Amino acid sequence: MEFWESSAMPDDVKREIKEIYWEDRKKLLFCQKLKSYVRRILVYGDQEDALAGVKDMKTSIIRYSEYLKKPCVVICCVSNKSIVYRLNSMVFFYHEYLEELGGDYSVYQDLYCDEVLSSSSTEEEDVGVIYRNVIMASTQEKFSWSDCQQIVISDYDVTLL
């Protein structure tokens, strides 16, 4: 700490270190927040809380996208088919819920899926299979993968790419 406070380190270097630290901290907090929303969505039995979790997740992603000034895409990349089904179905239920309330659809609420999961496959076929679905994009209907922030929901974590 003494070195940090001494004049040996220029102010612009200190400022750069602080910016990098706070950017990493924001990313970590954002991932933790998304993990809590995924847990809320995956809890069976409490439909209202799961819908609220979907809404909160979308709101957080939209805000983060606006902060970054680039589109964010959530990708579900898990080996458990039931998790993929649950996340996808909760997003669809949220769309129906908005329709019932008379809400209008904006690009923020569009759903993108890159593959359809077949329900006819057996458990033996599913061993070692990774299901990859793009669940939602936040600010644009069309986007470039290289220009967007990818948020990956995996079996054990939520990460930013």
From Swiss-Prot:
Q: Does the keyword DNA-binding apply?
A: no
Where on the tree of life does the source sit, at the highest rank?
Answer: Viruses
Q: Which UniProt keywords apply?
A: Host-virus interaction, Inhibition of host innate immune response by virus, Suppressor of RNA silencing, Viral immunoevasion
Chain intervals for the UniProt region annotation (Binding to host SKP1 protein): 9-21
What does this protein do, in the record's words?
Interacts with and disrupts the function of host retinoblastoma-related proteins RBR, which are key regulators of the cell cycle. Induces transcriptional activation of E2F-regulated S-phase and G2/M-phase-specific genes. Inactivation of the ability of RBR to arrest the cell cycle leads to the stimulation of viral DNA replication. Acts as a suppressor of RNA-mediated gene silencing, also known as post-transcriptional gene silencing (PTGS), a mechanism of plant viral defense that limits the accumulation of viral RNAs.
Instruction: Summarize the subunit comment.
Output: Interacts with host SKP1. Interacts (via LXCXE domain) with host retinoblastoma-related protein 2 (RBR2). Interacts (via LXCXE domain) with human RB1. Interacts (via LXCXE domain) with retinoblastoma-related proteins (RBR).
Name of the protein in question: Cell cycle link protein
Name the encoding gene, please. DNA-C
